[in-house]
A protein has these predicted regions:
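A short alpha-helical cap/connector motif
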Residues: 1-151, 155-200
Length: 200
């Protein structure tokens, strides 16, 4: 995928992101992939979910970008001073802290049993292979018909085939991968994506 369009096209995610609070545009260069994917859902997305809150920089980005969506932020660290105060009391932001987002009981109780469907789900959690596999098994179940699942910061190229084996058969045709290591600082700048969007 060519990313040269960034040089000439205004990128709303780039405009909105605070590079001091998120490394998606600095260390990793993910926004060049995300903009064409997410711009299709900018107005229509109703639920966006990310595992891995840290300071809340990306949660704030999704809140500002998807104006009509509820943003779900999950983290196994308890809520603490690292999370920016201005995202804690927003009506469209729901934070789940001190929990295991990869636990099947938590997932079922919090999302599946409530019938919540997500337009976009992202895993920016501990970056372990086992948690990534669990993320696919669990959160692919709550994607909308044209939903997108993204796993960030994949440590090894060999993991991509392992992760694809976790994808339900009916979703395997939608798998995309991006190796951005040549333009990024971090050597784990690899993305695994299930893109059910109708426009590709």
């Amino acid at each position: 995928m060519k990313l040269s369009w960034l040089k000439t096209t205004k990128n709303r995610l780039v405009d909105l992101i605070n590079d001091n609070l998120s490394d998606k545009n600095t260390m990793h260069k993910y926004l060049g992939v995300y903009e064409p994917l997410m711009s299709r859902k900018k107005e229509t997305a109703r639920n966006v979910l990310e595992v891995g809150i840290w300071t809340g920089g990306s949660i704030r980005l999704w809140y500002d970008y998807f104006k009509n969506a509820t943003i779900h932020g999950l983290d196994w660290f308890p809520e603490n001073i690292n999370i920016q105060a201005d995202i804690k009391n927003k009506q469209r932001i729901k934070l789940y802290t001190g929990i295991d987002a990869y636990n099947e009981d938590f997932f079922k109780r919090t999302f599946l049993d409530k019938g919540i469907k997500c337009d976009i789900v992202l895993d920016d959690g501990p970056h372990f292979l086992e948690t990534m596999k669990a993320f696919i098994r669990l959160y692919s179940q709550i994607l909308t018909d044209d939903g997108i699942l993204i796993i960030e910061d994949i440590e090894e190229l060999e993991w991509l085939d392992i992760l694809k084996n976790e994808v339900p058969d009916n979703l395997k045709q939608y798998v995309k991968t991006f190796d951005l290591r040549s333009i990024s600082i971090h050597q784990n700048s690899i993305l695994f994506i299930i893109d059910k969007s109708k426009t590709n």
